[in-house]
């Protein structure tokens, strides 16, 4: 049991540091890729997984085996000829038009704007361009929303020279039409759409993106030369709707994966403090003006 991401993935965090994998829970953060590669933590984590044990940071994949990101990483690694490749992901910036209930201002400028002036604007683009571009074979973009970011627009116009696969995470509030041209250049493009509910559940969790806009744009992506899949972050807000989401994905022939939310703890399905949960939800509704 081993995950190739331990050798090849670099994730940008909102504070400009790097971590190993975007699906890890509370991984250590490092100032540079070089510092992470030479860390005792990485040596110990690789040894642990090579011994058939799950590192604490990898609990999200452990809970969703055999349909975990680890399985996807194994396939991707097997199909990659360049052995010193990098898979780069994480937060390039936090410019986003949505204020999803499970998100925060470090991943969404829309949430920050609701709290008043002085909210953080994240920009890791300089750090990205310092990476060895020729080693970047897989690009895994998420957080904020690519359509609303000038940094992502620049990136899509200046992709690394050896890039083979491109994955973007989107709230599906609009369509990235430029992906057609990129796919036609022979780059495998995957669009991962965050789907945290059907109908009214979606409208609450993914506020303020309307379900009808989400659905229309999702159907447009189905007509494009891209691999399309759905991703669900399961929380107390949508756990009861998970079967409906899975049914929706099956009916439309779209691959679907999910993992359980760990933070904020108030919205975790493992949280037993109902008073804290209800207070958190009420505060978020008030912030967004939801009656």
Task: List PLM regions with ranges.
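Catalytic cores of alpha/beta
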Residues: 236-252
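Acidic (Asp/Glu)-rich catalytic clusters
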Residues: 181-188, 222, 250
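Detector for the c-type heme attachment site
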Residues: 62-64, 103-109
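Accessory C-terminal segments flanking Radical SAM cores
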Residues: 1-75, 262-291
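Leucine-rich repeat
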Residues: 127-133, 155-160, 181-184
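Core AdoMet radical
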Residues: 85-95, 106-123, 134-149, 161-177, ...
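Recognition helices and adjacent regulatory flanks at domain boundaries
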Residues: 52-86, 96-98, 117-119, 123
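Generic structural signal for well-ordered alpha-helices
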Residues: 156, 179-180, 215-219, 242-246
